[in-house]
Each structure stands twice: as structure tokens, then as C-alpha cells.
């Protein structure tokens, strides 16, 4: 049976339908807003795999080219590996739903969102978030939803839910929020140096906006009436648990206070091995359970120490930032470079400047576009003392890179003022928490070192949360273990003036306004401290670019002169690039960017282009080349492709019988423009130029 519900979200209608398509899935919905439609399915296997120790949730998101009326641009003309945008959307869907499955549910579960129709004004990513929740709600999966997503913008001080493409162009923030009826579950987005208070208002505006969508999902689940699977809590061997605590607790109390990550992990591993060995005979085959109880001990001890004593694993209080060191210009051939170290997290970041040829081509549902600023984040296994087989960047690397890219994008100069393609690469060389925020800091430093005129330096910080009942502690600059053992990972980046990017993920049922407000305020204090440390090395962009970076000079020509610059079959522009070695980019407005690392070559190219587009001016002197001798005079080229006639009467002050007595083809001759007729024909005089001095 087909069931349909509708919800109004700030003037837009969202329709969710189930029972018509993909009926063999555990749950399936078609969600629609405007002309955007997404099919979302959820399937969970009937049982878990033998020995499964974690919840294997997979989320896939795919944009079908036909959804935008396009044929894929690849060689095979079909959809291939996920684009960065598709990967990022997978993460948007995954992060708010993952914490809402019960402990003990270890069945393979897959959520698939397929965009089958798309317009520019209704974001399929937002509909996919809602659709994933709705598909799980109508399935038998033990999902503690619903959740809903919304994008919030702000134009002229007014918040907008799910803004159109045109509204987003004018918006000073773009934030995606996922929420339940009671609380915020996830936040991600960027802002143009917006204050913490304004961000908080935007987030809770979004929370209010999704309430009708949540109600519609509950209504749909009630209509469908699929009973949920009953998941029994794992049976705990209380005797074994008590024995593990008796043997390991005192040692673990000391181990979790070891400040250095490697030494701490070695100590915990040693305690685990000793405990497993001590209980092996009495509790045969209990190694996995013992390790689980040790992990539980670590979880409880770390959290208790923070809540009761206000002291963290490495001895810091909740607000202290780890020691920071920074260095720039460490890579002599890079256009800009920085080494950023915070505690045991470290990144080498390099900035490279390019021209329009280096722009990234994006093939999307809505057509081709070009990307002028890119940030690529790499997380090699050695950064955490591990080995692995590395191929393409994973979802995490793409997500962290995009967060840092958004943070820095807000302070870039306008492209008209700084017409370069910019690529930032962050290679994480050590990691113990907050490597994406180290990338933001290092990226800011490397751009200043490269001489990119950014509006202001940007720093980032990762905040954590430990919540026990009504008590909670917010942690500044979290360690990797605090991220793992805590309840929230809240990354905030920005300048001294305001926030440029943020991302929040939680592992509990949601966070309140009080917690979010406190976290944002504490993050601001930490960010200001980090900016101060960065300023000790470099406080503003250098006044000049690296000697190895291309210099781009912009000139303008009249639109009707573009064809003269290009020439037949590109002959003219090719002759300029071959003669000078520069790179030239021309757009249809008459804007020409000339790029070269050699100033003399750039100047010569400009001169050649000026000659190609120059127009004769009456009364002006020109040094020309004789192109053709006629009985009545000589044709002299004063610019490439532009010549004029020197009539025989204008050759000399004396009467000239034969033109060839004065001029020969190929001669250089100084002439003066004495007129231009209505047809544009140029009249030149050698006679009037005699005795005059020519300067270019």
C-alpha cells in the first residue's frame, strides 16, 4: 500500500512517499521538494556475522546524471567513483543517524540515497538526510529516530531555511543542521566571520524549522506500522567483569594519567595482556571480553577524572591549549609553506599558486563549473604509528579537507584582485587529535608566507564534551583519546572577528542550547589564543610573492579586439606565447591574464598584445615596416596586422619620382598618422615625421 505524508518547512513543501518503489528493501521512501526527488532505501541483514565486534553501517549517496538531464562526461559515459560532493553527502547522512542505533545491533546495515531528479533550488543532500531517517523509520531496523536535516542561510539579517541558489549567493552563512525533536545532533557549515551568538541563533532557527518534518515522519511510520526488531542487550559476564576490575583498575588509574600518547597506550596494552593471561585458565576463551572490560574501565576512569577533578589525561584543565610551535618558509621551492605543531599533532602545509589552466573542472548535476581554491588533506598511517595500504583519499580525508577549505575560503581575496588558482596541501605528520584544525592553522600560515593577501589569519580548535547526567565538562583542544572516549567533537575555525567554519558530531542523544553556547564561547577564547601564537611567527601576508610563483598581470582590451589578439586559428596568441613563454588566458569580457615567473617576458607579452589591439591616432608617430611598394606610394605596417598608406606625395619634402628610390620592402620607417577616413583606412606621412624623435 502506498502511503504519503507532507511537511511544510518555511514555505516549502516536502513530500515523503513509501510503498510504491523498492518494496523489497527493509524500508524505502521517495522524498520530493520542488523538482528534486531522491529515492532512499534502508536494508539491514537478518543476523550479524559471526564474531562481529562493531556496527557495520554503510551509507551511499549517488547523483544520477539523468537527474539533471545530462550524460556523464567520463570516457565510459556512466556514473563512476563518487565525486567529492557525493562523498561529503554520505558523511552528512551517516553522522546523525549512526549514534541512534542500539548497542548490540551489529547486523550489516546499508542506507542508499539515489538522486533521480534535481533542480538548483532544492538541495538533494538535505532531502537525502531526511529520506534516510524516514526509510529507517518505516523499516524494522531498531532506529531511535526520527531526525531531520535543514540548511540555514541568512540574507539581510533574516534567517532562511533551505535557501535557493540565488539566496545562498547573498547569504553570509551556510549551515547544515541535523536534529531530533529534542536536541541538535549535528552541525556543519561555513560563515563570513559571523559571531558566535548569531551562529547559535541560526542553529536553533534550524531546529525549529525541522519540527514539522519530524512530525511527518512519525505520522508515516505510524501509517506503515512495521514492528521494530527487538534487540536484546548483550549479556554481561558480571563475574568476569568484577575479576578484571580487581586485577586491572589500580593499574589503569595510573596508566590513563600518563601524558604521552605512545607511552600511555603501551601501558594500557601491558595491563590488558597481563589481565588476559591471568584469567586465561579460569575463563577460557575470554580474551575479547577482557579487552572490552578494560576499554570500559578506561572510559569510566577518564570521564570520572574530568568530571570530578577537572583534570584531563595529559594533566591539563578543561580550557588549556597544548603547547604550540609554528614555522614558515621551511620548503624552499614551495610558494608558501608552514609547519604547525600543537602538542602531538603536527602538519606540514604548502601553498601553491597557479593560473586559470590549473582550475579544477567540476562535472555536476547542474553543469560544468571551475574551482579556483582547493585544499587537500592527507593522513598517512605513519602519523599515528601504523601501517596500511593507501590508494585514493578516504571519506575522512575528503571531509576534513573540505572543512578546512571552507574555513579558509572566507578570507581569500576577490578573484578579480588576485587572479590566481590556489592549492593548499596539508600532510599530517603526527596526530593526536584535531588534525583538521591544525590544517586550518597551517593553511593560514602558508598562505601568508606565499604572499596571498588574505583578509585575516584563521585558526581552528576542536572542542570536546564529557556529560554524565546533569554534569558536563567542555574540553578545549581535545586529544584523540578524548575524542574517542567523549560525547562530542565540535570543531570551530575563524578569525579574531568571527567564525568561518564549524562542524559538530555527537555520540549521545543531542546537545542543548546551554552546552552549545558554552562550547562556542570557550572555543572563541581558545581560537584567540592560537591566533596570538601564530602571530609570533607571521602576523600578516608577505608583501610579495615567492620568486618561484607565477606573476599574473591583468590587462583589458575592447571586446571587438579579442579576435585580433587570438588571430586566425589562434595564430596571433600562439606567436606571443612562443616568443615570450608566458601563459595567457582571455575571457569574453576582454580581460586578459598574463602569467610568467619572468617580468621581462610578461612585459614583452603585454607590448605584443597592445600592438595587436592598438588603433592608430591622428598626429601620433609610429615606427613601421614597409610591407608593399606601389607606384602611388607604400603600405607601412604600424602594428601587427594594421597598415596604412604613405602616398608618394608624403614620402619626402622634395618631389619623389619613384617610391623605390626612398623605400624598399622590409625597411623600418618613421611615419606620422595624418588621418583616418570613414572606412578606417589610415593615411601616413614620412615627410611630416622627418627630423622628429620617436620614443615608444
UniProtKB/Swiss-Prot annotation:
Q: Report the principal subcellular site.
A: cytoplasm
Task: Give the superkingdom in one word.
Answer: Bacteria
Residues annotated as transmembrane: none
Q: Which GO terms describe its cellular component?
A: cytosol
What keywords does the record list, in alphabetical order? Cytoplasm, Magnesium, Metal-binding, Nucleotidyltransferase, RNA-binding, Transferase
Q: Which residues bind Mg(2+)?
A: 483, 489
Residues of the S1 motif domain:
619-687
Where does it localize?
Cytoplasm
Per its UniProt record, what Pfam families does this chain match?
A: KH_1, PNPase, RNase_PH, RNase_PH_C, S1
Q: Which EC number applies?
A: 2.7.7.8
Q: Which GO terms describe its molecular function?
A: 3'-5'-RNA exonuclease activity; magnesium ion binding; polyribonucleotide nucleotidyltransferase activity; RNA binding
Q: Name one GO biological process term.
A: mRNA catabolic process
Q: What class of enzyme is it?
A: transferase
Tell me what reaction this enzyme catalyses. Answer: RNA(n+1) + phosphate = RNA(n) + a ribonucleoside 5'-diphosphate
Q: What does this protein do?
A: Involved in mRNA degradation. Catalyzes the phosphorolysis of single-stranded polyribonucleotides processively in the 3'- to 5'-direction.
Name of the protein: Polyribonucleotide nucleotidyltransferase
